[in-house]
């Protein structure tokens, strides 16, 4: 039997251990120093090419405004960021707000694809996500808080459920699973992260069954605090049924049509049963909306919306309806260039409007309709017009200004003007 020889590996490790420990300590000290270098007290910090990478390494959630000193939109954004910064820094997952003069540090801006001002990006552990949401301080906080929240929150008590609902606010719908396995909704929590809150309640009292109107588990409760709506899904939790419920519940049962909700419809492929009213804020209209809500709950394959000609006559007139038309009317709109009128159900009369809406839906599903074209722009055209008109005016002014500068100073001396991002 061959004799075994003792290898010097343990001795080598003993010799290497002190320098390895020193190296690790130096890394830790460097990271701590970098973290202390950037204030966490809610101030907006100014970064340059030399400090930017260090900030990415030291700050888990860094919200960066790539700006230009001459940009008017950037100047209007600055006080909103100043207001939002201390609130964001105080979140359970703090977000630090920073700004970079990307007109001066163009190489840094180019690295992250900055081609206009302001460009806003949230860096999550160094990975950039462009932010294109609202720039108002309160909505900015709500939206960014949504970015850093877990895909699905785990709630272990009644107080945790209450805190989750309060902290989520009213900007996004919520889905809370009671007795639902987390794995069933985890994928949807990631897929629809930017559009809704998701949570699973592990432990809860019967009080919440009363509050959210469910009588058995598993149950997935959908909440729309902004519209004071809620609904319950009892399954089945397999196949496409669960995602269909989630996708259809991202919108409230009855959608008030305005510039904000019109954009939300772009992510939904259902047709819209649209009630056109004289004034969507009066008592008669409010009663009709309640009837529409009941119909919407039973017809989830359609979106139910309403709009008042008093509130938005420009939009209503695209359906060949004017202030002299007899209202309310019901149509089915494909969200683009066509809509359908149901024969014999063009106008809702006073009386039993629930029965009239049922007859309207029956006629629509039976194909007793007349198709018409919208008289204005298509859905996408109307959406684009909400933004493009202001952009067009700005571009005209910019080109006019450039023309004057070229005329008086010569083309060679004309400074480069980079594009500004509107909200």
From Swiss-Prot:
The record marks 72-73 as: Contributes to redox potential value. Residues 36-149 form the Thioredoxin domain. GO terms for cellular component: endoplasmic reticulum; membrane. It is a single-pass membrane protein. The chain crosses the membrane at residues 386-406. SUPFAM superfamilies: Thioredoxin-like. GO terms for molecular function: protein disulfide isomerase activity. It is found in: Membrane. Keywords: Disulfide bond, Glycoprotein, Membrane, Redox-active center, Signal, Transmembrane, Transmembrane helix. InterPro entries: Thioredoxin-like_sf, Thioredoxin_CS, Thioredoxin_domain. The active site is at residues 71, 74. Its main location: membrane. One of its GO terms (biological process) is response to endoplasmic reticulum stress. Glycans are attached at residue 181. Residues 1-35 form the signal peptide. This is Protein disulfide isomerase-like 5-2. It comes from Oryza sativa subsp. japonica (Rice). The gene is PDIL5-2.
